[in-house]
A protein has these predicted regions:
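Extracytoplasmic electron-transfer domains, predominantly the class I c-type cytochrome c fold
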Residues: 26, 33, 37, 41, ...
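Beta-propeller blade signature
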Residues: 233-243, 291-308, 363-364
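Surface-exposed loop and turn segments in beta-propeller and other repeat-based domains
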Residues: 184-199, 249-262, 299, 308-329, ...
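Electrostatic cytochrome c docking/interface patches
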Residues: 23-50, 325
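Acidic, Gly/Ser/Thr-rich repeat motifs that build Ca2+-stabilized beta-propeller blades
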Residues: 107, 114-282, 338-340, 346-353, ...
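Short pre-active-site segment immediately N-terminal to redox-active cysteine/selenocysteine motifs
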Residues: 43, 51-57, 62, 67, ...
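Conserved blade-ending motifs and adjacent loop-strand segments that build the rim/top face
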Residues: 333, 444-465
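Sequence/structural segment immediately N-terminal to covalent heme-attachment motifs in c-type
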Residues: 40-61, 83-91, 148, 152
Length: 484
């Protein structure tokens, strides 16, 4: 306490001295050097203020994308004319985007701003910064970032036992990288269904059967138009590759959904397939406790567990509850963009919150994760609604972020190439274009390090057979983090 009082006394003397000095000094005009910062004409547009207040939380600063998609690139799902953009702003799209009660003049200003951002982006590539050529130094490891290949709107990758990599492109193609080179021809014959309006997203995640070396099964999640109305149908399919062709195609599961970006898959040691299906609930009109993510009869906002052929296991937690979907393993999830097992067989999930509240969770059988009633973020509506961060009977995250980095996929590192990374969890970020290394002890975070920042929106993360960490970005880069 004495030190604190002495500090205040010293501060008081300093303030007095400054005041006295100012009193004895003649007043004079301050001459400042002219600013060298060029004004940004786009940021000065009337629509910029409206966008920053109402839209940037989802779509990122200058519309480059965060949790929501970029509005400054060539991928337009709901049309690219001024009328299309205005219609989307005014009417929204259930359940992903709220309708906004703007005046016609405000909508005109917003459309003009989005148009200006798009034109500016054509001149300067905002999406992919230069891959660093120098060695990256982190707390316990040094590495170089190498570009393996480039793609168009990729989503996920997996390595085959022979070292080749399969990469999905959301427009509906499956590509092959062999010995560090992208093969010119895509895999043919994958039934991708009716193309979504605009380029959209069709083929998403990919996984190999645990006995792939014997049976050759490859699993995909595919988004298709919903013939019954708005939204999509999400499918889990499997097939085999013979030569350069997709064969033996089977549909194992399908469900209507409003989310076309959150279907991740992972197999456990027993050969069960786990799949995530999101529910953002941005504009869900009913009471939060009645949201689809908390409704056991609805697949959205869930982690699902199935046999390798799509059947529901008899020991799933809700198989004996009338009306419940027998595939449900856990519920109350928002946007699950990553799923992975650690070396002990524990299932982990990375999840986008709304305004804040991004999470990494341990997924437990039959557990409730709370969304949208319980979250460390804020719900999106015309105005944000605050939910409770904790509630009895609801699981708490192991890691939580605020503000939100828009976390994406994740992977555990178990190789010896970077020995001091062993057992660490790597999580990608779309908003900050980062890669996080998380050190865990007894299933609790003890350290978090940002090992890479600013290259591009990280969409997928994995570890290759060579022990290197691989990243796939929205800008089309397939990157390798190799020892320096």
């Amino acid at each position: 306490m004495k030190h604190w009082i002495a500090g205040l006394a010293g501060a008081g003397l300093f303030i007095f001295a400054v005041a006295a000095f100012g009193a004895d000094t003649p007043s004079r005009a301050i001459v400042r050097a002219p600013s060298t910062v060029k004004p940004d004409p786009v940021s000065a547009l009337p629509g910029a203020k409206i966008f920053n207040e109402h839209c940037a939380g989802c779509h990122g600063a200058r519309a480059v994308g965060a949790e929501g998609p970029s509005l400054s690139d060539e991928y337009w799902i709901h049309g690219r004319t001024d009328a299309d953009i205005g219609k989307a702003i005014r009417g929204g799209f259930d359940p992903k985007m709220a309708a906004f009660d703007f005046t016609d003049a405000q909508i005109t200003d917003l459309v003009a701003y989005i148009r200006a951002v798009f034109v500016a982006t054509l001149v300067v590539d905002r999406s992919v910064q230069a891959v660093p050529a120098d060695v990256q130094h982190t707390e316990v490891a040094d590495f170089r970032v190498e570009t393996v290949a480039k793609f168009t709107a990729p989503y996920a990758f997996v390595f085959l036992p022979d070292g080749r990599a399969l990469i999905t492109e959301t427009a509906g193609t499956l590509r092959v990288v062999d010995k560090g080179k992208l093969l010119p021809e895509a895999i043919e014959g994958i039934p991708i269904g009716t193309p979504l309006q605009g380029p959209g997203r069709r083929i998403l995640n990919i996984a190999l059967h645990p006995d792939y070396a014997k049976n050759g099964w490859i699993y995909l999640t595919i988004a298709d138009n919903n013939p019954a109305g708005r939204g999509f149908v999400m499918r889990v399919v499997r097939g085999k590759i013979k030569g350069s062709r997709w064969t033996d195609h089977q549909v194992l599961f399908e469900a209507p959904t409003g989310e076309a970006s959150t279907a991740r898959m992972a197999f456990d040691r027993q050969g069960y397939l786990f799949m995530t299906l999101g529910f953002s609930g941005n504009i869900y009109p009913g009471p939060p406790e009645d949201a689809p993510s908390l409704d056991l009869s609805d697949p959205n906002g869930k982690v699902l567990r199935m046999h390798d052929d799509g059947r529901a296991p008899a020991d799933n937690p809700f198989v004996n509850i009338p009306g419940a979907l027998k595939l449900v393993w856990s519920y109350g999830h928002r946007q699950s963009l990553g799923i992975a097992f650690d070396s002990k067989g524990t299932l982990w999930e990375s999840e986008n919150g709304a305004r804040g509240g991004d999470e990494v969770n341990i997924i437990k059988k039959g557990a409730n994760y709370g969304w949208p009633v319980v979250t460390w973020g804020h719900r999106y509506d015309s105005i944000p609604r605050v939910a409770m961060p904790e509630m009895e009977g609801v699981e708490q995250p192991v890691v939580s972020w605020a503000p939100s980095p828009a976390v994406s996929a994740m992977a555990f590192y178990e190789s010896d190439v970077f020995p001091r990374w062993k057992g660490n969890l790597f999580v990608g970020s779309m908003k900050y274009r980062s890669l996080y290394r998380i050190v865990l002890k007894e299933n609790r975070q003890v350290l978090q390090e940002e090992v890479l920042r600013g290259i591009d929106r990280v969409r997928d993360v994995g570890v290759g057979p060579d022990g290197c960490v691989y990243l796939l970005t929205d800008g089309g880069l397939f990157l390798r983090l190799a020892p320096a």
